[in-house]
């Protein structure tokens, strides 16, 4: 998938790191509400082998960029304009999040908004990158 600047990212590019893949859209209120806790999680694990990839579902770069400029978030935003990737992951509800281990295997999947600063979620991710 392309990021907001047009660079292509593949999950394989992140092998060796845990990846939180979050599917979202600007029209999805729960998606917008969970973004700050995703950023807190990212910051709390800064410097470790962990990355957040936020996949915007069905919207264009301008819509996604406008959103990101209003909210200071330090993770990578990707665009799934045709929703094929979203469907391939089985993300029928937004937000949908998948935690992929450093080996590339999906370890956890969550449907609906979460508070990513919860200790149990942080501990599950930390266990993957220790």
Model-derived regions, located:
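A short beta-strand-turn-helix
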Residues: 1-19, 42
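Loop/turn elements at helix/coil->beta-strand transitions in domains of secreted/extracellular proteins
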Residues: 16-18, 48-50, 75
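Short pre-active-site segment immediately N-terminal to redox-active cysteine/selenocysteine motifs
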Residues: 17-19, 23-27, 93
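Hydrophobic beta-strand core positions in alpha/beta domains
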Residues: 20-22, 52-54, 99
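Signature tryptophan residues that serve as conserved aromatic anchors
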Residues: 24-27, 31, 89, 116
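Structural microenvironment flanking redox-active thiols in thiol-disulfide oxidoreductases
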Residues: 32-71, 81-88, 123
């Amino acid at each position: 998938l392309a990021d907001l600047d047009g660079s292509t990212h593949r999950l394989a590019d992140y092998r060796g790191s845990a990846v939180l893949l979050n599917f979202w859209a600007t029209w999805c209120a729960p998606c917008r509400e969970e973004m700050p806790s995703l950023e807190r999680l990212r910051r709390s694990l800064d410097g470790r082998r962990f990355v957040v990839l936020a996949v915007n579902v069905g919207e264009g770069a301008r819509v996604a960029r406008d959103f990101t400029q209003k909210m200071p978030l330090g993770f990578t935003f990707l665009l799934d304009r045709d929703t094929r990737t979203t469907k391939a992951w089985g993300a029928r509800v937004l937000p949908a999040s998948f935690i992929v281990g450093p080996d590339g295997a999906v370890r956890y999947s969550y449907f609906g908004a979460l508070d990513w600063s919860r200790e149990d979620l942080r501990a599950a991710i930390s266990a993957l990158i220790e």
